[in-house]
Amino acid sequence: MKISDFTLPEIEYFRANCNFVNLEIEVFERRAKEITLEEIAEYLHISYDYARQISVKVNKKIIKVL
């Protein structure tokens, strides 16, 4: 799922209703700006695999509120 494909009102809805925590917020915001997981991992000083794991959690939360 590409978060950047959602409209701005949809992204705002996810921010308000998905209850993202800590790194999930960071990953969500950067994915909304089309930043790759590799770049996100580097920026947050975490491994790529951990960034991918957080991204999966973000996707699951988005699917729950859809």
Task: Describe the predicted segments one by one.
Residues 17-24:
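Short helix-coil-helix linker/hinge
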Residues 59-66:
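C-terminal flanking helix
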Residues 2-17, 50:
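Short, Lys/Arg-enriched N-terminal segment that forms or immediately precedes the first helix
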Residues 27-28:
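A short pre-motif secondary-structure segment
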Residues 39-44:
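Short alpha-helical "recognition helix" segments of helix-turn-helix
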Residues 49, 56:
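Key DNA-contact positions within bacterial/archaeal DNA-binding proteins
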